[in-house]
Amino acid sequence: MARFQEFYKEKVVPGLIEKFGYKSVMEVPRITKITLNMGLGEAVADKKIIENAVGDLTKIAGQKPVVTKARKAIAGFKIRQGYPIGAMVTLRGRAMYEFLDRFVTVALPRVRDFRGVSGRAFDGRGNYNIGVKEQIIFPEIDYDKIDALRGLNISIMTTAKTDDEAKALLASFKFPFRN
């Protein structure tokens, strides 16, 4: 069992039951999945960009991402239907908890000028989104071997009904909120 998974069962669940007064353990919010998404609009010009991005996401997530393709043609962006324009990977279970552990304890502190993550990036249904500007904050990425700095979006889906419950859940995982 992953370190954060044990931490959730032993510390987070009792703390949230005490804070929100849940009657059952099954009412306590939990993280269901984490999705990493990398949009690669510049991949239209060069196919190697997709390969490098897939390699980076594979190292970061520990599993192979799926290449997302354009749903429809957009002439202004020089994109045809079916062109590869991104990569995404969905993490669940043990891999999800291990990624969350690495993200909170190792990757976030490596962000330049880091003052904490925004407490307002919740969607109203208990899900949280973080944008990362550079993939080099992850220790799995070798700085000398990257071709370009690419950002990615990290979406954390929870079973929380409200944003307050989700924020309390993530804060109990030692998420460094700034407000």
UniProtKB/Swiss-Prot annotation:
InterPro entries: Ribosomal_uL5, Ribosomal_uL5_bac-type, Ribosomal_uL5_C, Ribosomal_uL5_CS, Ribosomal_uL5_dom_sf, Ribosomal_uL5_N. GO terms for biological process: translation. GO terms for cellular component: ribonucleoprotein complex; ribosome. This is Large ribosomal subunit protein uL5. Part of the 50S ribosomal subunit; part of the 5S rRNA/L5/L18/L25 subcomplex. Contacts the 5S rRNA and the P site tRNA. Forms a bridge to the 30S subunit in the 70S ribosome. The gene is rplE. HAMAP family: Ribosomal_uL5_B. This is one of the proteins that bind and probably mediate the attachment of the 5S RNA into the large ribosomal subunit, where it forms part of the central protuberance. In the 70S ribosome it contacts protein S13 of the 30S subunit (bridge B1b), connecting the 2 subunits; this bridge is implicated in subunit movement. Contacts the P site tRNA; the 5S rRNA and some of its associated proteins might help stabilize positioning of ribosome-bound tRNAs. Keywords: Ribonucleoprotein, Ribosomal protein, RNA-binding, rRNA-binding, tRNA-binding. GO terms for molecular function: rRNA binding; structural constituent of ribosome; tRNA binding. Belongs to the universal ribosomal protein uL5 family.
